[in-house]
């Protein structure tokens, strides 16, 4: 039996991270340059504000959203920032290399930084399913593989189906969620007694997680509209996301109270359920021209999120062998699928309304894009899970899952650290 004492990454982490950072610096030196075009000041400020909103979502929103565990709050916040910083650098280079043929110098613009931040956000969503199981060295591997897989998926879908930037990211939620769940399925499962002790929600960390939720709630409209070019589509995306988020908040709080025998509200459900409308409407937010449809989507999404939080964890743990600590499956993958179905229905209605007889073709194309995204997510997730199980990464023992003391310096350490 392997030792339960934590495995030190003192040599492995600095060597891996700093070598990778040096390689990225060299790549930026030889293959990138800034955009030399003269943008108008108003457009530059507006573009920067959207990028700033995305960064706040990633660093504060997702960072604190996963910090509710009693003994794993420090790692959740800091590891998310580490993955964001690394993921943005790699995504800028990768997107630049994949978007031009033959390859040449990568032109860095505010839009490319925005796109790279969204790619890094995919990693933060996926990491919610594995935080507590892995160390920083393993997360470095996960960042590199997932950003590469997402960039490849976008390039393949763009070349096959001739879609724009926004449509390339419509499968973002489904890809990130199923990638993360697949990786979690490959990792060793936590010991039952350790899980009961450490995988618990504490009051103060839970309040911090709610703070992350509030930041995400405020900036989600910017996220859904970040890659849209048309002013009308951007306006629709912002309005519809706000309506869907508002309804999902009311639904989440009401149904959470209904689901409890004494009518009490579960704060754990609130962390994700109040965001359900933003996830569900993300794929089709630019197509919806009336607020009532966005509100219906927010209502359905809130019901799915609360219902999933109450009923699905046992099924995932027992049947699928997935310990989904951050409720990734029913808060992103199921709601992402709801958004995909809504998009297909809206596209069919638009095609019929325009008198176009290509309804079957449109359904086939949309279904093909979704199937391809799922296939790449699961395949790359399996590859990542197998890589993370290699002993060279010095993964934490199952007895040390969900424990900040494995990674952080504390004034008074417990015995065994």
UniProtKB/Swiss-Prot annotation:
Broad class of the protein's primary localization: membrane
A GO CC term attached to the entry: plasma membrane
Gene Ontology BP, a term: ammonium transmembrane transport
Cellular compartments annotated: Membrane
Coiled coil region boundaries: none
Keywords attached to this entry: Membrane, Transmembrane, Transmembrane helix
Transmembrane segments: 12-32, 44-64, 77-97, 125-145, 172-192, 203-223, 238-258, 265-285, 287-307, 331-351, 358-378
Keyword Transmembrane: yes
Example of a GO MF term: ammonium channel activity
Topology with respect to the bilayer: Multi-pass membrane protein
Record flagged with keyword Transmembrane: yes
Function: May be part of an oligomeric complex which is likely to have a transport or channel function in the erythrocyte membrane.
Family: Belongs to the ammonium transporter (TC 2.A.49) family. Rh subfamily.
Protein name in the entry: RH-like protein IC
Originating species: Gorilla gorilla gorilla
């Amino acid at each position: 039996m392997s030792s339960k004492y934590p495995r030190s990454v003192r040599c492995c982490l600095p060597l891996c991270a700093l070598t990778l950072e040096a390689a990225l610096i060299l790549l930026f030196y030889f293959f990138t340059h800034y955009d030399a075009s003269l943008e108008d000041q108003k457009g530059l400020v507006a573009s920067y504000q959207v990028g700033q909103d995305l960064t706040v979502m990633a660093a504060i929103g997702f960072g604190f959203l996963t910090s509710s565990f009693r003994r794993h709050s420090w790692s959740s916040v800091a590891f998310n920032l580490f993955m964001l910083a690394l993921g943005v650098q790699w995504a800028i280079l990768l997107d630049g290399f994949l978007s031009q043929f033959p390859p040449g110098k990568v032109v860095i613009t505010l839009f490319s930084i925005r796109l790279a931040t969204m790619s890094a956000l995919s990693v933060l969503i996926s990491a919610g399913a594995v935080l507590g199981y892995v160390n920083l060295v393993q997360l470095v591997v996960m960042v590199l593989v997932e950003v590469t897989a997402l960039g490849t998926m976008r390039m393949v879908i763009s070349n096959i189906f001739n879609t724009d930037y926004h449509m390339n990211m419509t499968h973002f939620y489904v890809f990130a969620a199923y990638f993360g769940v697949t990786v979690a399925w490959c990792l060793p499962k936590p010991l039952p007694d350790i899980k009961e002790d450490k995988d618990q929600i504490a009051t103060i960390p839970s309040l911090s997680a709610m703070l992350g939720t509030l930041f995400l709630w405020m900036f989600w409209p910017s996220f859904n509209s970040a890659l849209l070019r048309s002013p009308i589509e951007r306006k629709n995306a912002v309005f519809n996301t706000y309506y869907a988020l508002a309804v999902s908040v009311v639904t989440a709080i009401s149904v959470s109270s209904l689901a409890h025998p004494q009518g009490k509200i579960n704060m754990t459900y609130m962390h994700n359920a109040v965001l359900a409308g933003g996830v569900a409407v993300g794929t089709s937010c630019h197509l919806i021209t009336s607020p009532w449809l966005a509100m219906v989507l927010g209502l359905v999404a809130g019901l799915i999120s609360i219902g999933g939080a109450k009923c699905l964890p046992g099924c995932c743990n027992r049947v699928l062998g997935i310990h989904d600590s951050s409720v990734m499956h029913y808060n992103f993958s199921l709601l992402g699928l709801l958004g995909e179905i809504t998009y297909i229905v809206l596209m069919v209605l638009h095609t019929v309304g325009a008198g176009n007889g290509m309804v079957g073709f449109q359904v086939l194309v949309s279904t093909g894009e979704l199937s391809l995204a799922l296939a790449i997510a699961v395949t790359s997730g399996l590859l990542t899970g197998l890589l993370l199980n290699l002993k060279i990464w010095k993964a934490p023992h199952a007895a040390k899952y969900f424990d900040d003391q494995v990674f952080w310096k504390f004034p008074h350490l417990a015995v065994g650290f």
